[in-house]
Amino acid sequence: MAALREAAARGVRVRVLVDGMNARLNLQGSAALQELAAAENDEVRLYNPVDLLRPGEINYRMHDKYILVDGSLCLLGGRNTNDRFLSRTGQAENDDRDVLVYAPQPDEHCAVRQLENYFAAVWSLEETRPVTGRDSGGTALLERYAALRSGWPEAFEPVDWSGATTPVDGVTLLHNPVGAENKTPELWDALVHLMEQGGDVLVQTPYLICSSAMYDDLRALGGGRELAFVTNSVEGGANLFGCADYLGQKEKILGCGVEVYETLCGHSLHTKAVLVGDRLSVIGSFNMDMRSAYLDTELMLVIDSPEINAQLRGVIADYQASSRLVRPDGTQTEGTAYVYVPLPAGKRALYGVLRYLVRPIRHLL
């Protein structure tokens, strides 16, 4: 928030979209948010703010995460904006992945331009409401920015974006419908169509929570190509409900003809990526679950680049080495860097209960 406040003070137009549920849980009464919303050149809006008179709409969340700058640069991925995801290197509780797109001369088909149009569509929704800030004359955010700049000057050095990025053959934005309502699974369907194009598909996702229709798609995909998922092991995953559901659904998942790498790497995986063949890489916010398919706003960026694909396969290979590979026939192989950590008895008992309790609400996990 300090960086956004400082940008506005320099005359930059700043617009911030915040998920309404996240704002209720984490930003209620936030002096920093009030200072930001009250500042000249700053606007803050909430997507589907919590209304206890409309409890049926609480579950529609804004789950995508991105930053747009000057119509030529965007950063997009699965990383939430809090300390669990933005701590110093090696201290974050979750492993995540983002992709930066630099387009100094964007045309109307450019992914950055597509993301601008997407932002405008969400910003103008009836269910997106402005935050009215209180101007108390406070300067806490500007003071925080000055302290950050003094303490970490290397983070503020100019960046040669052309030199820091890799030329690619194409980038395309995929997204869900934007309204706060039950959604047709447009993004899931698009991902399935992409996966159908490759003979070797590798998916990294925090959890696998599928509907009957999603299982049908996985069976069709698993029957005609190599399809593997890299996901959290129940010993290392941070989402208790997702891990409990996996235990209850594991046999059904493997029955789709897919391989599963159960990763135990010291951190909980929060990355969302799909690699199709040796060219396509898809990165964004979409979890392989029903909430991402049917309820939330989601974004995925499709990158056509053998070089990026190879880089990502190399990174994911490290996670595979720290995994327990489970095959469709139930046989298992431990990776070269896999270190077994026993599941505590208390956690095992909790999973045993939760795997049954979550069944009626799997679509909300």
Show where each model-derived region lies.
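Charged, low-complexity intrinsically disordered terminal segments
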Residues: 1-43, 49-63, 69-365
